[in-house]
Amino acid sequence: MILRRLLLAGSLLLASFATAKKDGPKIEVTELEHEPKHLFYFEDSDVVMLQHKYDAYISTDAGVSWAPVKGPDDHMKGKVKAIYHHPYDRTKAYVLGQERTHWTTDDTGKSWREFTIDQALPRSGNPLSFHGKDSNKVILHTIECSGFICQMPALYTTDGFKSHKILTKAQHGCSWAISTPEFAAREEFPENVDNRILCMFTGLHSPIGTQKRLLYSDDFFEGDRGTEVPLNNGRPVSDIVSMVGVKKFLVAAARSPRTNELALYVSDDASRWHQALFDGHRLENNGYTILESTNYSIQVGVKTSGGFNPMSALFTSNSDGVSFTRNAEHLNANNLGYVDFEKIAGIQGIFLVNTVTNWEEIEEHHGGKKKIVSKISFDDGRTFHDIKAGDKNLHLHSVTHIHNTGRVFSSPAPGLVMGVGNVGDSLKEYDDGDLYVSDNAGITWWRALEDAHKYEFGDQGSVLVAVYDEGRTNKISYSLNHGKDWKTAELPVKIRARTLTTTPDSTSLKFLLLGTGKGSSERKHYVIALDFSDVHERKCSKDDFERWPARLNEKEEPDCLMGHKQFYRRRKGKSECFIGEEFKDPVPELERCKCTEEDFECDFNFVRSEDRKDCVPARSLPVPEGQCKKPEDKYTGSSGFRLIPGDDCIKEGGLELDKPKERSCSDTAKEPVSGEIGVSIQHFDANKPAEYYYMERPTLSKDKDETVMLLTDKLEVFMTKDHGKTWQQILAGKNIAKLWPHTYNNDIMYYVTGEKKVFLTKNRGDSFREFETKLPPNRDRLPVLAFHPDPERSEWLIWTGADNCERGGDCHSVAHYSTDGGDEWHTLMRYVGRCEFVGKGGVRKTDELIFCAQHENEDPKNKHFRLLSSENWFTNKKIHYKDILDFRTMAEFIIVAARAGKDSLKVGASIDGDTFADAEFPPNFDVKTQQAYTVLDSSTHSVWLHVTVHNVPDHQFGSIIKSNSNGTSYVLSLSNVNRNNADYVDFEKMQGLEGVALVNVVANVDEVVKGAAKKLRTMITHNDGAEWDYVRPPAMDADGRKYGCSPGKKGTAECGLHLHSYTERRDFRDTFSSPSAVGLMLAVGNVGDHLTLKSEGDTFITRDGGIEWHSVKKGNYIWEYGDQGSIIVIVPESKPTKTIFYTLDEGRTWIEFEFTKVEMQISDITTVPSDTSRNFLLWGTEVGSGAKPGFATVNLDFSGLKERSKKCVLKEEKPEADDYYIWEPKHPLLEDNCLFGHVARYHRKKPDSQCFNGGEFEKLHNVSTNCPCTRQDYECDYNYERQSDGSCALVEGLQPLDPKRICTEDPNAIEYYEPTGYRRIPLTTCEHGVKLDGFKAFPCPNKEKEFEKKHPGLRGVGLFFAIVIPIAAAAAVGYWVYNRWDGKFGRIRLGETSRSGSWLSRDSPLVVVPVAIIAGTVAVMSALPLLAASLWRSFRGWMPVGRGSSRPYSSRGAFAARRGDYVGVVEDEDELLGAEDFDGDEDEEV
């Protein structure tokens, strides 16, 4: 009893049972109280470890006896979270603790060393990343959380955790460049690769951490510096999905925006990267699996069908890992990404796959049952054969139904293969299978045992062990002659087998069987050691072995692969002996062959011909130096073939396909550069286009199409794949009434008819299919189709149709949903107003979240709607509001407008889709029911609303209000903003830059209310709406004449640039700016005191984000950006023309070009939405003499221009060395370039570089270290409003919000701050500097102890010195400064802090600090308690007390804007003087 208790205290019960029969194995059983996990062998030893609940146990005798691992001073007991072995060092292992202490061994578990870290470990996954060459180099991924905000720091060690350092404070996965021994075996590496680390980081300003980038560092990200990996032809790539090491390759996957397509990038030296080509096939999200690969190629399973029955195609790369060839179609796969593919261990070129024979049925009906058959290849996938058991076909369960640890079919035992399956037409269920064996690497098979069994190999195949796997058993089976005959051995206990394993190299005669006994509440677990050492009495001699060929060809002769035949020394099946060479891996004998066609692959710049027999140039070949003076010349170049690296075939007497051959210099010729703009005019027999949409190809795609879909007013559909050079009619006679592009996937377009039939393309018009819905389109002007925002759920649809609308019935709208692209539909909700998928995002964690508006009482005549949501297709539902007008879903917020009584509205917001909070509108804001609001934007961590305050037709205007970061508390940003009858607002945010927006305000509000026409003025913000100013006009017009007014440094009400905006556009897609042309905007307007008629306007451009504007053309033009702003085309909007103007230098010079001999009235000019193409499309009608009827399109192709024929060069490590420079946007009122608390630095093409940008790439180079906070980083808080001097004051008669609310809203809150009238702009990341949003902290109720701990005060002598010494010092310094200062003491305006100037300037700390402290002595007695806490907080703000630096990562792609992680710097002068004491000079007023 005492012994049992002692064992229980160690959480392990030991009981031994032994058998000693000579004709069977020796069996030892250890009983466990808890199920063991993480069992592993130290390679080439009998030492085994496992985890037992919260303890680690070790055995040094192959599992016969076990002892707890105690660690130094027995500290490990009861503290183990997980155990891991080092995959490349047989002596190392790691025990990770539940807290901050962990242990490591480097002597196979004999001794353990303890190390402690400051961070916690992630909840799941292996946090360790290993170096493939130096086993002392390890990366440890950790996590740090503060409230609901978590970051993931990474640590690294170069001495096996004898010491460790912070690698980076925020990452999404880091790995050594040399991550495998195969990669480390490369003979030569670029410099510094040995220490190179690659990490995934949150993208720069990625709103909710969705986009990630890949950076590398050779100095462990010293100084928070890293370089973005140049994946795409030397350029970085956004939105990285994953990065892994595969044998001798590094593989990174990236996602293209607005599509489900992925791109795969491969490197074999961690320096040069190439995009993988998949033989015309496309990769999709969660659509590929890196399979077991070789040292000379990568195998990838690419998903070819989705749904619940996925299938994959097998692709094999060349030796560079770049060019992939399709080997097999319709491989069986599962939803976890596993593919039924496995190589035979130790033998090159042989692998088994499972394929689906009824794949057409599965693709058509996703819920069908697969018919799976097994195939085997003996020649690296070139051909596949049936697996034969006698004369019948054998089918085996593979990776998708794995039932044991380790490999499925084979082990290092040469040629021995086992599997569970059945003979017949297709694979049956696992429990209907039997155990089959092959001893010739899969050529022939036989049934070894009835029923399904787990199995394992020992002594290089001399012993095969199996255990029943369909239920409980008390025996094992084993074979000593390659599985032809079997014996059984009784187990002392009856178990359900869980794992059967042995040493990784299968050279041992000892096995471990893990199983579970009977019962559920008191279930026992067992580790059973099986030892076959005594079954045979003798060790094998020379005559017991054979020279066994690993591969045979169709003539059953030894076959060649990679230039050699492969043989093994293997024990004969009938020999009654054991090899007994423990831990000595079987070594193949290689016999070289003469070279054949199979030993060669296509050389770089070459691809396989269509018949797969030759290698042809993939692109124009490089010109050999000193050759090819004339096109008709000849030169000696590559044959197109090369010997596969690593292939050791004998060339003498064999094929020499890589022998250089004579080529024509015409192969090197590039596409001719005509030097002219190409023009293609196409006419249509229709009056006008009804609608047209670009289906832009994915950014990372290798496709070249530029697809546009067009629906004419005659309801005819046309498609172009070459940007309008040619058009073809599609879906003729199908009665298409509406084009409906997929909101989140550019590859998908729906063609809606007036009935139930819908047509669809999923590949930008390459093919079409049709499906039927349950109902025809609705009649309530509701969106017919709604899409899921997740690219992986692109087939999830909501269709809103009309029901019971015939003959005056109860006509209403019904929503149906489909998860398979429209094949099957299910009712979602009846009597709906509108339904939308919300999906994951931010704190929303489910894909099934749907919101619907539904008529109250399910009565379509009832115009009151309620808002409901569900996470299970409305099997269960939640009612959020009972009387709403409408709702909107956005990236971070869900916004709803609901009635609050008879004559007012209320707005609710949610970030999690579950809990809504009513918005707190600014004071004096009473939104009447008959008035309106417009959701403007939610991309900068806040919601922008326009609330109409005057709603008379043609006289509408309102106020823009902006929310806090959770969308609930709104402050007034700007009043009297223009709106039109259709509820559109003159508001536009600049694309590509943070926080810049333009609006038009009504200048004559009083007159407009009385019925007068509006007079509009344009205003701009550079800090996300916290401050607005009039736009500063240019000094001269396009003809070089001065304007009639000159405002000075900034625009004024009397003299500003006023621009025609959103409410006047024909097409709302025609914006001022472009996301790819950073800093550029074009607009039409005029200089003066208000906006005049558009017909009287001129055309203007800005190149610096709206600070300086230039008049470029007299008159009203429409414009379009091309090649990311390196080409801009303008054309007259209001008059017929034959010409366009274009600029190649951002509007500094303009060139006129005649594109037609017949005048045309142009209605629009377009290009691809990303503005990256060199092609443009004019839409218009011919007028005047020679005009043709109907409308026409004109393609303008600028790719023939010499100035745009060469691709620009960008090197991330030297960004200004070639065709680009670094540009920093700035605020016009600041002397430095800090915006939103940081300096953003962008790549921009040099205007004089004669080249083209090409595909879209990330313009943001990096974000520098965070800046000190200034007034521009704050906006007015709730119930406060901005004054004329830029300060924030409480609205008369109102009170601040109760600051204690945070204590109830956040249970983890320790303190709250006294309201100051200011709050941080949600977008800012500033640190230190001016702190305006919280001077004085108070403890939350019942959190006094925590508050004191966080803010320890000064007492006694310390307090005395803290007061007296600064005053004395300040007096001395103040006297000296006063006599030398350039001015008198005056008022300091709030927040007008300069970051530069002399020591004696007004903002010098030598002046400001003494002023603050001397002034503070006046109130020192009343401020004593406050000062004590203030001194501590100030000290903590300047010195890193109790925490590391909070500076986020500053290099490109790694900047994680940790909003909410701010250092609380208290400015003593602010706290003592109060905000009202700050003022400034007249020339510094805001």
UniProtKB/Swiss-Prot annotation:
Transmembrane segments: 1357-1377, 1406-1426
Signal peptide: 1-20
BNR repeats: 57-66, 376-385, 436-445, 478-487, 718-728, 817-826, 1100-1110, 1141-1150
Domain of life, source organism: Eukaryota
Location of this chain's protein in the cell: Golgi apparatus, trans-Golgi network membrane; Prevacuolar compartment membrane
InterPro entries assigned to the protein according to its UniProt record, in alphabetical order: Sortilin_C, Sortilin_N, VPS10, VPS10-sortilin, WD40/YVTN_repeat-like_dom_sf
Keywords of this entry: Glycoprotein, Golgi apparatus, Membrane, Protein transport, Receptor, Repeat, Signal, Transmembrane, Transmembrane helix, Transport
Primary location: Golgi
Cytoplasmic side: 1378-1405
GO cellular component terms given for this protein: cytosol; Golgi apparatus; membrane
Lumenal-side positions: 21-1356, 1427-1486
One GO BP: Golgi to endosome transport
Family assignment from sequence similarity: Belongs to the VPS10-related sortilin family.
Function: Functions as a sorting receptor in the Golgi compartment required for the intracellular sorting and delivery of soluble vacuolar proteins, like carboxypeptidase Y (CPY) and proteinase A. Executes multiple rounds of sorting by cycling between the late Golgi and a prevacuolar endosome-like compartment.
UniProt-recorded name of the protein: Vacuolar protein sorting/targeting protein 10
Organism, as annotated: Coccidioides posadasii (strain C735)
